[in-house]
Amino acid sequence: MAKQKFERTKPHVNIGTIGHVDHGKTTLTAAITMVLATVGKAQVKKYDEIDNAPEERERGITINTAHVEYETEKRHYAHVDCPGHADYVKNMITGAAQMDGAILVVSAADGPMPQTREHILLARQVGVPYIVVYLNKADMVDDPELLELVDMEVRELLSTYEFPGDEIPIITGSALKAMECACGKRECEWCKSIWELMDAVDEYIPTPQRAVDKPFLMPVEDVFSITGRGTVATGRIERGQVKVGDEVEIVGLQDKPRKTVVTGVEMFRKILDVGVAGDNVGCLLRGVDRKEIERGQVLAKPGSIKPHKSFSAEVYVLTKEEGGRHTPFFNGYRPQFYFRTTDVTGVVKLPEGVEMVMPGDNVRIDIDLITPIAIEEGLRFAIREGGRTVGAGVVTGIRE
């Protein structure tokens, strides 16, 4: 069978299943593909195919992730599901699977469990903006009052972590029964909940703003001068767009950003009208000396990002087997933090009551860099020692 062309007619959204081990995340993922396959909107993925997820490497970290795709009438979805709890932690912190929204799976028979709480906290920390809840295994609960109780508990837990617990849609059903039935009819006792869930995901999780519509930002990878024309900074545009005549700021490695004007945009030595997110371009900058700009800085829309030295982050520390440290680290640890294109040394401050951090842990820390870098919430980074990756993190807040 010939490969189908990827149709870009529908808006694209990235989602994933999160929640406690054995609450039914993978079963639900399989059930979604089976139900949607009945109307030609997905390819069936069996439980085992999803559960035996292949290993991937992101920033030197091994993560097991299953990717499935499907669509509804309204949108196209890329859905990630991870077999193990550690995989979720790594996935969410490295941003390997960027989620525009998540389906939190909670077993109605057990209610919220430790990892339910941990995944909600992680979602809050790493900036997963929306959550929809699937209350699974409802076939195992005879008492409707018990379902109501779990519903309330989940809403309270979500509110604790600053999600709008009262507004979040909670769909009740049984992923296993839907998977076993797989007739896909909306009126079916079991398949109905899958349709309700997809409707809730369609309605409640907004279509994300496309990278090209965000304010311009390009990490500077290389700098050279062209005799008679000036200084060119090259890099891959991370977001937004840039054209000749745009005012931009050079941000990072200096205390104050510096304004300049783009007098030329080139791609593969050809002149471009406009460079957009994803393009590798060279920007000719007016009045900037070759020595006044360097790798590690960014070009950005004025006022859209500032240089900072102090921030909070959620980090995952690699295990020895992953090529990380063999020993714990303590307060005052001084590794390098690799942001976008450059390493900067920083000092780690552990939270109160935490004596040390072991390989394999995930922890919230405060970091003070020795030079300012263009930083914002949600920015991913690697922690390195002598060029070797020993951890991964995401900025959760700026501290000045």
From Swiss-Prot:
Catalytic activity: GTP + H2O = GDP + phosphate + H(+)
Record carries keyword Nucleotide-binding: yes
Residues the entry annotates as binding GTP: 19-26, 81-85, 136-139
Pfam hit, one: GTP_EFTU
Gene Ontology terms for molecular function: GTP binding; GTPase activity; translation elongation factor activity
Chief location category: cytoplasm
Annotated spans, G2: 60-64
Keyword Lipid biosynthesis annotated: no
Keywords in alphabetical order: Cytoplasm, Elongation factor, GTP-binding, Hydrolase, Magnesium, Metal-binding, Nucleotide-binding, Protein biosynthesis
Location(s) in or outside the cell: Cytoplasm
Binding site for Mg(2+): 26
Region (G3): 81-84
S-S bonds: none
Top EC class for this record: hydrolase
Main function: GTP hydrolase that promotes the GTP-dependent binding of aminoacyl-tRNA to the A-site of ribosomes during protein biosynthesis.
UniProt similarity note: Belongs to the TRAFAC class translation factor GTPase superfamily. Classic translation factor GTPase family. EF-Tu/EF-1A subfamily.
Family annotation (PANTHER family): ELONGATION FACTOR TU, MITOCHONDRIAL (PTHR43721:SF22), ELONGATION FACTOR TU-RELATED (PTHR43721)
Record-linked HAMAP family: EF_Tu_B
Subunit annotation: Monomer.
Name used for this protein in its record: Elongation factor Tu 1
Species, as recorded: Pelotomaculum thermopropionicum (strain DSM 13744 / JCM 10971 / SI)
Designated gene of the protein: tuf1
